[in-house]
């Protein structure tokens, strides 16, 4: 398994009892890539401070998702913890993408991270706490010399 470093959201109740502050939720369906055993659907907390998605490990295993690596995540209190992650198909708001999901404790609140949101052109409006579609997904032009 590959080991990497990253950060967990600083404003969500996720791992190790961090306090929840965000209130935007969305229905998300996760499916393992390549021959999984079904779909896990849940009410996910949208957290723009989280890079990756997070779901209960037991639910991920039920649908055939297997860990493919581990990553060290820094929690809001500054402590670092290592967690396994797998790769999944992510469906929400009529969109589909694929990405990394952290195998969290079985009682954890699922999180939808910023990578999944940005990859389908959805952003969060902090004032209304709603998700909004961008008119277009930005691409940066690469300069050639």
Model regions and ranges:
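Pepsin/retropepsin-fold aspartyl endopeptidases
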Residues: 2-145
């Amino acid at each position: 398994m590959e080991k990497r470093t990253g950060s967990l959201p600083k404003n969500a109740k996720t791992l190790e009892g961090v306090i929840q502050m965000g209130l935007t939720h969305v229905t998300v369906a996760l499916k393992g890539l390549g021959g999984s055993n079904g779909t896990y659907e849940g009410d996910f907390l949208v957290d723009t401070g989280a890079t990756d998605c997070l779901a209960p490990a037991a639910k991920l295993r039920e649908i055939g998702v297997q860990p493919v690596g581990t990553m060290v995540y820094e929690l809001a209190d500054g402590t670092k913890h290592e967690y396994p992650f797998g790769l999944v198909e992510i469906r929400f708001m009529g969109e589909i993408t694929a990405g990394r999901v952290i195998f969290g404790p079985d009682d954890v609140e699922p999180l939808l991270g910023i990578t999944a949101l940005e990859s389908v052109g959805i952003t969060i409006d902090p004032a209304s706490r709603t998700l909004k579609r961008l008119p277009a997904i930005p691409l940066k032009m690469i300069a050639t010399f």
